[in-house]
Amino acid sequence: MQNIPPQVQAMLGQLESYQQQLQLVIQQKQKVQADLNEAKKALEEIEKLTDDAVIYKTVGTLIVKTTKEKALQELKEKVETLEVRLNALNRQEQKINEKIKELTQKIQAALRPPTAG
């Protein structure tokens, strides 16, 4: 890195930072997607039950009885919240990818040898 100009070194540092941010966003996205899939599956199963079915849910370390109606409402809200979060993470991932692409182009241009005109 001795031959690399300081401004390019700074850009490389920024690029590394963006890549780390991207990794974190991707990990968060995977977690939210898994939670969303799980919530949708639970919603499907509860919708199959009769209205008077006995349903239990976990609350912290407890398991408590609930109604089908309450369980459906809570799961629908959870799915909606997770979908909003997933959309936000998708936008964030896209913005970071754009920054990475832009910065990579700047770095490549800065390292390109000047052409004799």
From Swiss-Prot:
Its job: Molecular chaperone capable of stabilizing a range of proteins. Seems to fulfill an ATP-independent, HSP70-like function in archaeal de novo protein folding.
Gene Ontology cellular-component terms listed: cytoplasm; prefoldin complex
Protein's name in the database: Prefoldin subunit beta
GO molecular function, one term: unfolded protein binding
Family the entry assigns: Belongs to the prefoldin subunit beta family.
UniProtKB keywords: Chaperone, Cytoplasm
HAMAP family, sorted: PfdB
Phylogenetic placement of the source organism: Archaea, Methanobacteriati, Methanobacteriota, Thermococci, Thermococcales
Compartments where located: Cytoplasm
